[in-house]
Every structure is written in structure tokens, then in C-alpha cells.
């Protein structure tokens, strides 16, 4: 699992948690939560009360319920002047932390100084029933209240008390004893939730033409363009080349929009009357609810829209109706996949229109078990603490675990399931510190992130590993802990899964009507902003900093470290070809005579029987694949600090990576970095120039730029054509191969004649300034 040279602290570790997969617990098979460790809870459901006696002078009461178990106390909200209140609240106490044998449920009357006791109910924990799904929920019962001496008093309380697990339906909305220090205002921020990304569409606006425009200055030809606005997205067409009152553009503008459509598309026709002054000639607003939808590449009908104009008359805005109009073709593109995350870590590749979706090929089940070794993320009461929760994103579904308060070893043991439509996708996990509970900073801090590509997983196998949580800081890479996950990919149809590998990665509209790289980058940025804004409006919100971190918003920003990492990745890819070249050089120089003789024999066989060449190549590749099967990866890939060049990054390069855009550093630092970038660019420029020179020399072979060199090459081609025509191909190939593999005794160290001729050819470098 650990790669050579990698720090063992940053390595992936295989674990053996006590999960319920395939095991029998009690009398029931744990199938719903079989990828997590089973956690037992005491549940208390407080439903309502009736006929509570009045304790005030007025004869009324302000009741609330207090559930006490040892040192833990949970309270419902209180009602004013209600003798028959309804709470419908659930309390969950972790069995691991229970240190008492009696559960006490107390009904009290809220008072200014001291709350009065109305009555209580006592439960022996040994007598409480057990309930595990798929059993039906336990029906609540009416219990008569008792005073401190055990005597029956007036009033009844409807309760349900049972021992259950985290698989219980009441678990997610319950008050938890491990969050007892969190006040009522913070409870909503610590519960587990499932979020759905908004459904995103591309909006294509084909601006065709306008008619009968009325400019203010009729003495000059108008320079007209169309400005389109949708939310905070603004795009402009080019200025029309037809300088008339009926300009034409026939230009496409692309936007991103999310359902439900809350904003209208606003189009304004503007005239460039001066370099920094534009005049609006008319505008129109188009609700997107009325826009037609396109699922394929078939053209749709265009429409004419009337333009309106508003002017100020005596301080009031008045609308002028005139005959100007604009010709548009507007539709929602359902055949594209709207990219809202980094293209390298996409978790969903389906088109927007659900009619075009293909059947799912499998299920992805994930158990978020625990974390350990977390670093203190904030200070509370003079000591470091962490309130950790986990977020996972795959497809349109986001999940957020509950927050474990004040723990460096949180145990979540929550299990989630996703449908899988393509294995060439990535699920992303992020761990965060909750900053929205008492003592928090108001911002959720990053603890670390884990990515798992589904295509690297074997079907129907459970992967249980502890993944390092790594975060970049201005001081360098820092390990903030480890997270323990259990992952299982279940294949529903092997035929469909294998057939998927023959299909295009993206929907067909991306290939029939492709979008430019600049368009895709801009649209992806807009889609990220829309998803971030929508999830930030949920309750509880999934904060903007969380969504941006999970979607890798800053993945396109310049980083010297990433550039080095990508360069060495290329060198690693080319290392195989370089090794083959070195091996061939050793063969040609007879470093190992036996191997060289065997290569001669193999070469002669292939020349005499050329029909064996392709079968031999594919058989060789087959044998390599079978041989490598013994050493196939048995664990998912993880964040590699050595590959990322994160373990030896220069402090200034790291500071540059954390710089804002535009820069916020001093002019001296920016000048130094600019000079460094110029130096690197100069070396890149030299390499590119050398490549261009070699290509231009090749083109000049027949260009007669050097008449003597071209004459020699033309004569050589004529002689070669005659020789190859009269000589069997096998003889030519055999002689050429033996010449290349000749013994060093028949070689000399000077360059060959063809190479000498090639290096003497002219290039366009002489024409550069």
C-alpha cells in the first residue's frame, strides 16, 4: 500500500472494523447498516401530555419535559398556559456513555425562579424493550405521572422508550446526548442531512437579428450589440457588421440556470455611441418557464420579441412602445451534461434531461465509520477542540453526517447509498470542523479530503481503509488526522457495465455540437456558483466554503508545485519509451551478445513471416497483462504526497499558491516571482523553438529553400523508388534491420549521412527578429 519513499504517516492503512457485513447480530441479519459498526442507543420519544394540573396562581401551567439519565439531561421546549401540550421530540442516549440504571422523565412547570415539579415517570433500563428495523416503530403509551414519593398524581404523559441502533428512523432527528452542550439554537447545525444539487440546464440564446431600431443620433451608423443578462451572468455579442437599423449577428450565447427558474432572461440592444458610453435602444424580459427544451441536435423554431424602452419624464419612468423587435432562438439544452465540478473528478456524466438517462449499472454503498487523531481546529474554554462532521458528494446527492461535539476521535457510523450510472466517476469525502455551534468562528474549517474512483474498485468487495486527511497550509502539508471508510460497489448488470466502456464519456451533444474550452470553463464556474448558492440556502445550510472545497473551485489556479508534479507525471509516462530506447541501444551496441543474437533471429523470422507481427505484438501484450495480474493493486488510490510534490515544496512557491487572485503580495515579491516565471518561460520557449526548427527542416526537404539539399534528397528518392521497385520488400527490410543491428566494429562515432543532411537544412529561425 505504501509507495517507495512515501512518508508512512501519509500512507493508506487497511483496517478491520467490526462491521455487520455478512454477520448475524442477535436474531436479525444486519443488512441495512452492514458497512458500519453497530451503535446502540436508548431512545425516548416524548409525544404529548394531557390533563396537567395548574401550578400558577392563575391555575395554568407552562409545561416542559426533562429527560434525565445519569449526568445527561435533555429538555423539550416549554409551552405557555397549556395543560395538553404536544412536543413530538426524540432523545437518544449513547449506550457506551450510560452510567445509570434508571431513566427519569420529569414534567416541570416553567417558572421565573424555580421550576415546579408536575410529575415524573421512572424506567428501569433492564426492562426497556429492544427494537431493530425493519420492525415497525414502537407505539407510544400513556403513563400516569407520579410525585417524588411514588404516589400517582393528576396528569398523563405519552411516551415510547426503547433500545435501538443508528438504523432507527428516529436517529437523524433525535437530540443526542453527545451533543448535550449544544444549545437549542445550534441543534439544527449538527444533525445529519441529505442534500440534492439543483437540476442544471444550459440555456442557448441564438441572437439572429433586430429590426427597426431607433437610435438617438440619426446622423451616424449605429454600432449595435446585444447584452444578455441572466442572474449574475452577463454576456455580449460582437458589434454587428451590418451598420444599419436592421443589424444581424447570428451568434450563440450560453448560460447556466437551475430549476426552479427564478429569474428571467433580460436582453438589451445597445448602441456604442462613444468609447465608454452605450445607449440602450430597447430591451425585453423572457421568463424561462416559457422556453422550449431541446433533447437532441434538431433545430427549433425562432421567435420575434418586441423591444421596450423606458425614459424619465418629470422624474417618473415611463415606457415607450415602438415597433423595434429582435429575432431570437432560445431553448434549454437537455442533451448536455452541465459540468459543475472539476473534469478530472467528475461524479456524474449524465445529460440534464432525465429521458436520456440510461439504466443504472450498480450501487455504491459507503460506511463513514470514524476518524481518529484529529488536530485541534479551534479553542474553547482555553483548550483545543474539534467538532467534526463529514460530507460526501457523488452525483447530485450530497450527504452530511451529524457533528460529533468536542472529540478528536469521532464515531459517526452512518451508511449511505448512491446509484451508479458510470464507473468512470469519483466520490469525494470531506471532513470539516463545525464553526456554527457555540464557541465556533462562524466558518467551517477544512480538516481534509479523500477521493475514490469507482473504476478502481472490484465489484462486490468491501474495502475498509483508514485514509490520511491532508491539508495544505502556508507552512506546508499537514496531516490533520485519519478517516475510516468502508466502501462497496455492487454491480447490477455485468453486460451493461462492460458495454459502458464502449460508449462516449459525455452525452452525444458534447460531440455533435461541442462547446469550446473557454465556454466550458466559464460555464463550469457559473454552475459552481449556482450550486453553492442553492445549497447555502438549505436548512441547515451547506456552506459556500464547503461546496467550493468539495468541487475543487481553485483547481485551475496557477501553482508551481502542480506544474512540477504534472511535468514529472509526463516523464513517468514517457519512462517506458525511454527504457525501450535504452534497451534497443544496448542491443545495437552488442552489450549482451546472446540477447542481440536472439533479437536477430526474431527479426529474421518476422521479416520472413510478416503475418506473425501483429499476432506476436498482441500476444506479448496479453502475456504482460496476465503477468501483472499477480501484482494488481488491491487497495483504492489515495492522496500521494510524493506524486503531488507536497513533501518538498519551496516556501515561496507555497506562498505563491496561497496568494489571492489578483495578487495581494508586495510589489517586490511579485517582481521576483515574475522574473522567476520569465526564466522558466525562457526555457520552455527554447524547447518549443527547437521543436519548431526540427519540423521546419523536415518541411524544407522539398521546398527548394536550399536547392542543393533538395536536389540531393530528390535524387535519393528517385534511386530509392527504383531500388525498392525491383527488390523484394523482405530483402530490403532484412538488409535494413541487419544494418541497424550491426556490430560496433562496423560503426563509427560520427553522425550518419542522413542526419548530417537533415541538420544542414534551413529553418525559419533565421527570419525571427
Swiss-Prot record:
InterPro entries: C2_dom, C2_domain_sf, C2B_MCTP_PRT_plant, C2C_MCTP_PRT_plant, C2D_MCTP_PRT_plant, MCTP_C, QUIRKY-like. It is a multi-pass membrane protein. Ca(2+) 1 binds at residues 56, 62, 109, 111. Its cofactor is Ca(2+). It is found in: Endoplasmic reticulum membrane. It comes from the Eukaryota. Ca(2+) 2 binds at residues 56, 109, 111, 116. Gene3D superfamilies: C2 domain. Highly expressed in roots meristems and shoot apical meristems (SAMs). Observed in flowers. Residues 23-143, 184-305, 345-467 form the C2 domain. Keywords: Calcium, Endoplasmic reticulum, Glycosyltransferase, Membrane, Metal-binding, Repeat, Transferase, Transmembrane, Transmembrane helix. Belongs to the MCTP family. This is Multiple C2 domain and transmembrane region protein 5. It comes from Arabidopsis thaliana (Mouse-ear cress).
